Amino acid sequence: MSSLLNISHCSYHGYSGLTSRGGINTVENHRWVWHNNGVRLSFPRAESSINITMGCTLQRGIAKSLSQENLVELSDENDDLCPVECVTEFKTDDELLSVLEKSKETNSLVVVDFYRTACGSCKYIEQGFSKLCKQSGDQEAPVIFLKHNVVDEYDEQSEVAERLRIKAVPLFHFYKNGVLLESFATRDKERIDAAILKYTSSES
């Protein structure tokens, strides 16, 4: 029986976040899966069924200028973080492919956070990533937020991580119309925010 992964969504409102201290080298595109000329994903046919009710929405507007002190204060308070269901966890290639296929119906951007439980930088960016799918926004720019633990229950590299040759985390992938547009490793929420704005603008 095929697995069923339900995705609930909320809305996204961009604003400035904490900057990273110390960069992580960007991971190259995985050419064995993708080509620079836009060849689509070549995973096996999906057997999983994933229900997407609606995409997270992005509100374009002037970014709020918040000081680092204010951001630290906000992170310590219960400031209505996006519910856990907003950032959906997937475990298999089939689940990822199913989301990518369904995202074509709404022209949604799919953002994937690849993480490891024992990774300090992954924990650092997790809250910021959750905040990126919070608050009401513009219905014209749907965004789907996903995450994947690159280490499986046997403390081995996951099938997805092995297939995508993921070597560094936290790593973020940006997909649209089933195509990987960009990937980079970072703990800087502003960089993720900028990529989302770039790929959900009217020109993209």
Swiss-Prot record:
Keywords: Chloroplast, Disulfide bond, Electron transport, Plastid, Redox-active center, Transit peptide, Transport. The active site is at C119, C122. This is Thioredoxin-like 4, chloroplastic. Disulfide bonds join C119-C122. Residues 63-201 form the Thioredoxin domain. Its main location: plastid. GO terms for cellular component: chloroplast; chloroplast stroma. PANTHER family: THIOREDOXIN-LIKE 4, CHLOROPLASTIC. InterPro entries: Thioredoxin-like_sf, Thioredoxin_domain, TRL4_chloroplastic. PROSITE patterns: THIOREDOXIN_2 (PS51352). Residues 1-27 form a transit peptide. Probable thiol-disulfide oxidoreductase that may participate in various redox reactions. It is found in: Plastid, Chloroplast. It comes from the Eukaryota. SUPFAM superfamilies: Thioredoxin-like. It holds the Pfam family Thioredoxin. Belongs to the thioredoxin family.
